[in-house]
């Protein structure tokens, strides 16, 4: 926690200072290169000149957690990789944010097994969920815009990690994924043949 956040109490109004700090934070979110599976290919594609991620101030991908603000978890998180993800998150300085990119990072994707973590939010707090399998670069940019909107509403009187998204968004996303997964495994019983008078066999 920084000196400024320690100095003021929660009932102290910092509207003008909040505006300046939030503007600086949202305009220079530095993501960390943390690709785990196929979603990382789309994350790398988003950093090319065709998509121009510099518009959002996120063109500086940092290889070190100590120099980054945003951890984009792109891909499947296995149980062996989970402690590494948690440790890297703890090494990031405040303020820090987490984006779950793709179905695997959000809810485990199609890998509903004992070896796969069913959502990275079980080990680190997630701010934005980017849907898709894998998500296109446009989806990643939409997630960055949502993160910038969230940063706009932060205040120095509260630690950034204390302000998290409502869990209803994740619950709705998980429910839709489970319905889609259950729909692919439903056994459809053959329909009974129609009864036509005079054609019944004994």
Swiss-Prot record:
Native species: Koribacter versatilis (strain Ellin345)
Highest taxon listed in the record's lineage: Bacteria
Gene Ontology molecular-function annotations: 4 iron, 4 sulfur cluster binding; iron ion binding; NADH dehydrogenase (ubiquinone) activity; NADH:ubiquinone reductase (non-electrogenic) activity; quinone binding
Cofactor note: Binds 1 [4Fe-4S] cluster.
Protein family: Belongs to the complex I 20 kDa subunit family.
Gene: nuoB2
Enzyme Commission number, as recorded: 7.1.1.-
Cofactor(s) of this protein: [4Fe-4S] cluster
Its biological purpose: NDH-1 shuttles electrons from NADH, via FMN and iron-sulfur (Fe-S) centers, to quinones in the respiratory chain. The immediate electron acceptor for the enzyme in this species is believed to be ubiquinone. Couples the redox reaction to proton translocation (for every two electrons transferred, four hydrogen ions are translocated across the cytoplasmic membrane), and thus conserves the redox energy in a proton gradient.
Subcellular location: Cell inner membrane
Main location as per UniProt: membrane
Subunit structure: NDH-1 is composed of 14 different subunits. Subunits NuoB, C, D, E, F, and G constitute the peripheral sector of the complex.
Residues that hold [4Fe-4S] cluster according to the record: 38-39, 104, 133
HAMAP family: NDH1_NuoB (MF_01356)
Keywords: 4Fe-4S, Cell inner membrane, Cell membrane, Iron, Iron-sulfur, Membrane, Metal-binding, NAD, Quinone, Translocase, Transport, Ubiquinone
Reaction catalyzed: a quinone + NADH + 5 H(+)(in) = a quinol + NAD(+) + 4 H(+)(out)
Record-level GO BP terms: aerobic respiration; electron transport coupled proton transport
Pfam families on file: Oxidored_q6 (PF01058)
GO cellular component: plasma membrane; respiratory chain complex I
Name assigned to this protein: NADH-quinone oxidoreductase subunit B 2
């Amino acid at each position: 926690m920084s000196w400024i956040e320690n100095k003021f109490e929660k009932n102290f109004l910092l509207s003008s200072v909040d505006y300046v700090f939030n503007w600086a934070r949202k305009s220079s979110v530095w993501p960390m290169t943390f690709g785990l599976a196929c979603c990382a290919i789309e994350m790398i594609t988003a950093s090319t000149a065709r998509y121009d991620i510099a518009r959002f101030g996120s063109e500086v991908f940092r290889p070190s957690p100590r120099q980054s603000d945003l951890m984009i978890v792109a891909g499947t998180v296995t149980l062996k990789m989970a402690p590494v993800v948690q440790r890297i998150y703890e090494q990031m300085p405040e303020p820090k944010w987490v984006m779950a990119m793709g179905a695997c990072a959000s809810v485990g994707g199609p890998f509903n097994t004992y070896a796969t973590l069913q959502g990275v939010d079980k080990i680190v707090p997630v701010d934005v969920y980017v849907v898709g399998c894998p998500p296109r670069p446009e989806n990643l940019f939409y997630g960055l815009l949502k993160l910038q909107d969230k940063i706009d509403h932060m205040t120095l009187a509260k630690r950034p990690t204390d302000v998290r998204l409502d869990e209803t968004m994740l619950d709705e996303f998980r429910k839709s994924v489970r319905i889609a997964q259950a729909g692919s495994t439903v056994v459809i019983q053959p329909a009974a043949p129609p009864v036509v008078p005079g054609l019944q066999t004994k």
